[in-house]
Curated annotation (Swiss-Prot):
Classification lineage: Eukaryota, Metazoa, Chordata, Craniata, Vertebrata
Disease note: Encephalitis, acute, infection (viral)-induced, 11: An autosomal recessive disorder characterized by increased susceptibility to viral encephalitis affecting the brainstem and induced by neurotropic viruses, such as herpes simplex virus-1, influenza B virus or norovirus. Xerosis and growth failure with immune and pulmonary dysfunction syndrome: An autosomal recessive disorder characterized by premature birth, severe intrauterine growth deficiency, congenital ichthyosis-like features such as collodion membrane, severe skin peeling and xerosis, and death before the first year of life. Patients also exhibit bronchopulmonary disease, thrombocytopenia, and neutropenia. Additional variable features include cardiac anomalies, seizures, encephalopathy, cholestasis, and cataract.
GO cellular component terms, semicolon-separated: nucleoplasm; nucleus
Bias (Polar residues): 413-425, 445-463
Record-level Gene Ontology MF annotations: metal ion binding; RNA binding; RNA lariat debranching enzyme activity
Name under which the protein is recorded: Lariat debranching enzyme
PANTHER family xref list: LARIAT DEBRANCHING ENZYME (PTHR12849:SF0), RNA LARIAT DEBRANCHING ENZYME (PTHR12849)
InterPro entries named among the record's database cross-references: Calcineurin-like_PHP_ApaH, DBR1_C, Dbr1_N, Metallo-depent_PP-like
Gene: DBR1
Binding-site residues for a divalent metal cation 1, renumbered to this chain: 8, 10, 228
Means of activity regulation: Active in presence of diverse metals including Fe(2+), Zn(2+), Mn(2+). Also activated by Ca(2+). Binds two metal cations in two adjacent alpha and beta metal-binding pockets.
Region (Disordered): 395-463, 476-544
Cofactor descriptive note: Binds 2 divalent metal cations per subunit.
């Protein structure tokens, strides 16, 4: 089947779907599935905008609300994970995944689903070592700390994913697995993004948690975004046992959705022709969710996952045949993901802006139904009970030094904290942190939300997106992608990209939809939303 992969979406749903439509007209057939690697920005209304970790003047409604309201419908089944610029209050309603709009499905904090027999997993957020061992304690209204910590990856999600034993076909993460740059054209990457050099040389660029998952899961494909550059790599894994076939992972990171940027790629993925063409739950993953329900922590206290160190009665939560049988019986042997989307919040109305809309910590009926079927407790229900008991959400958020559960280990598993680039990125505009702090929503006051008007010309294909490349039928990492190569005029590899039939797609001329001419030097395209993703907090790793 034909699968499209998008990098950082940044709310540009219309542009992405329009680009897909153009690619379909030029290509061999329709796209069956769209995968988005974070910064999706499922913003329904003005309150959601205030929960996105960017300065107020760079918050824009974009066009997702039209898909949420039913005014528009996604033309292709769309799956996405969360990044570090999201409507966090919206995604928090769906910790185990769910529909954010008809035909648009969020994978949750971490999740695994199946589509046409293809097993797709993902983890939302970015890595930060000081939040990694905390629970999911954040809830609206967020403060200056929780508006950022809510999208930081937690060890419980990594732990659950590491219980998987069956092969994964595709895995999504927002930030890159650490060290993946050593398996691709590193020289080309550093010529394109020279400010990565220090992190690459120190081997601190990317997420160590994602790297741990890559080593454990060994998926056929791994897609990421976050660093705003296209990069391919081929990682050959070592076989654990003699006689066992060594597996390999094809890694691809994509750019953000801007004109003349490599933000979209189409691949041919092998699938099971006899498998249903609707989204299915994954039985192994559901069994793991059920088994690990008692491990959920909704405080900010540090918490170590069970391990075989003599301190835990149980440390293996992988799915058993008996456990999977029980889950199947609970679901009446029906693994189809129900199309049970419902509107849970007021939708943005351009004619009636509501800049003082109240923030509410909602319980989503999709999550309630899912938890009832599986026999687990909604994280948000636990949070609300905790809030009632302590009169404040996230009471323990500053207690990083609290003794962790049943473990003598006080230090984080990882001694670095650089999921994203810590160098200054000249591709972005640095924003004043003091201004950023002013953006945080107070629990006791409403805040005006500037710039909530939708994007201009939302229904038209922008001329600035006219430089659309013919997309390859499949991703094959050629030898030129994993060795040093010359750089062309836009800092892109001089190597080849092959289609499924071996054709060199770099030789296909670029086709344009307007009379504009390609300049000798790359234009600086100033768009209303391109600067918002440069917001750097005091730890310098939430920039991308």
């Amino acid at each position: 089947m034909r699968v499209a992969v998008a990098g950082c979406c940044h709310g540009e749903l219309d542009k992405i779907y329009e680009t897909l439509a153009l690619a379909e007209r030029r290509g061999p057939g329709p796209v069956d599935l769209l995968l988005c690697c974070g910064d999706f920005q499922a913003v329904r209304n003005e309150a959601d905008l205030r929960c996105m970790a960017v300065p107020p003047k760079y918050r824009h409604m974009q066009t997702f609300y039209r898909y949420y309201s039913g005014e528009k419908k996604a033309p292709v089944l769309t799956l996405f994970i969360g990044g570090n610029h999201e409507a966090s209050n919206h995604l928090q309603e769906l910790p185990y995944g769910g529909w954010v709009a008809p035909n648009i499905y969020y994978l949750g904090l971490a999740g695994v689903v199946k589509y046409r027999g293809v097993r797709i997993g993902g983890i939302s957020g970015i890595f930060k070592s000081h939040d990694y061992r905390k629970g999911h304690f954040e809830c609206p209204p967020y403060n200056s700390s929780t508006i950022r910590s809510i999208y930081h990856v937690r060890n419980i999600e990594v732990y659950k994913l590491k219980q998987l034993k069956q092969p994964i076909d595709i895995f999504l993460s927002h930030d890159w697995p650490r060290s993946i740059y050593h398996y691709g054209n590193k020289k080309q990457l550093l010529k394109t993004k020279s400010f990565f050099r220090q992190e690459v040389e120190n081997n601190t660029l990317g997420s160590p948690a994602a790297s741990e998952l890559l080593e454990h899961l060994k998926p056929t494909y791994w897609f990421s975004a976050h660093l705003h550059v296209k990069f391919a790599a081929l990682m050959q894994h070592q076989a654990k046992d003699k006689g066992q076939t060594a597996r390999a992972t094809k890694f691809l990171a994509l750019d953000k959705c801007l004109p003349h940027r490599d933000f979209l790629q189409i691949l041919e993925i092998e699938h099971d022709p006899s498998a249903p063409d609707y989204l299915e739950y994954d039985i192994e993953w559901l069994t793991i969710l059920r088994a690990t329900d008692d491990l959920i922590n909704v405080t900010g206290r540090l918490w170590n996952m069970p391990e075989n160190n003599g301190l835990h009665a149980r440390w293996d939560y992988s799915a058993t045949e008996e456990g999977m049988k029980e889950v199947l019986e609970k679901l009446n042997h029906d693994l189809k993901v129900p199309c049970n989307f419902s509107v849970t919040a007021a939708c943005y109305d351009p004619s009636k802006p509501q800049t003082q809309m109240q923030l509410i910590h909602r319980i989503n009926p999709q999550t309630t139904e899912f938890c009832a079927q599986l026999g687990i407790i909604d994280i948000n229900v636990r949070l609300q009970k905790s809030k009632e008991e302590h009169h404040v959400c996230g009471e323990y958020e500053e207690q990083d030094d609290v003794e962790s559960n049943d473990s003598g280990e006080d230090q984080s598993e990882y001694n670095t904290d650089t999921s994203a680039l810590s160098s200054i990125n000249p591709d972005e505009i640095m924003l004043d942190e003091e201004e950023d702090e002013d953006s945080i929503v107070s629990a006791h006051s409403g805040m005006n939300t500037p710039s909530v008007e939708p994007s201009d010309q939302a229904s038209e294909f922008s001329a600035s997106f006219s430089d659309v490349r013919i997309l390859p039928g499949s991703m094959i990492v050629s030898s030129d992608d994993t060795v040093d190569s010359t750089i062309d005029r836009e800092g892109k590899p001089g190597g080849t990209v092959e289609s499924g039939n071996g054709e060199d797609l770099t030789k296909v001329p670029l086709k344009r939809l307007s009379d504009e001419h390609e300049p000798e030097q790359r234009k600086k395209i100033k768009r209303r939303n391109q600067a918002i993703y440069a917001a750097v907090d005091d730890d310098d790793d939430d920039a991308a």
